Amino acid sequence: GLNISLVHTDSIPLMSFLFKPFTSVLPQNFQYFGIWILLSTFLQSIFAYKTMKIFSKDVFICSVTTLFFLFAPIFYMRIFAQPAIGSQWLLIAALYLYLSPNTNYKRWFILSFFALMINGYLFAMVFGIYIAFVIKELMEKNINFTKLSLLIFGKFFFSLLLMWIVGYFSVGTGIQEGGFGFYKMNLNSFFDPMALYELHSRIMPDLPS
């Protein structure tokens, strides 16, 4: 084996756990990434449309704006190279919950569960939007500071428990991997993405280095 937790292989643990019971009947070369790409594309459009419906009830306007989410270049740059990180519908769903007037905390916990079972990076982003939502609730006087603390720390410890169960804290010792120093982020990367193979922006071109 690889002697490393599944969550560190970018293999979408949610799908792995779903198909694990059927290992004996599935082909040896079976993979679920194509299924996930199709599902992510569908969910990307669904949550984009639901988010747009908050701002407009016009079906045509919502449909057209949904296309911008569905055909966003950054979505296709990631979904085929890294299907787990390409699950950007999680972020759109989080924004929908933030903006929706009928959001309840059960939906946030469900979304966080799926995010953790898909990709840790996306979970961190979803958690950040959740914190912003809870602070907004406090500012609108829908909750008090005590409930805010319970909602944030309760979700934090629930997430830690789930991360421990799934294997986020399991680090193997048998794998040697390179890339350190190459896959790094300079402090000016917010202004200079330093694209390796293409120009990311004509407005803000790469800085000389």
Language model segments and positions:
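Membrane-interface coil-to-helix junctions
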Residues: 1-43, 72-87, 191-197
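Short aromatic-rich membrane-water interface segments that cap or initiate transmembrane helices
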Residues: 2-7, 119, 201-209
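Coil-to-alpha-helix initiation sites in intrinsically disordered, low-complexity, charged segments
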Residues: 12-16, 58, 178, 182-185
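Transmembrane helix-loop junctions in multipass membrane proteins, especially transporters and channels
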Residues: 28, 77, 138-142, 167-176
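Membrane-embedded helix bundles of polyisoprenyl
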Residues: 38, 42-55, 60-137, 155-159, ...
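Membrane-interface helix-loop-helix junctions at transmembrane boundaries of multi-pass membrane enzymes
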Residues: 140-150
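Periplasmic/ER-lumenal interhelical loops and adjacent helix-loop junctions
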Residues: 162-209
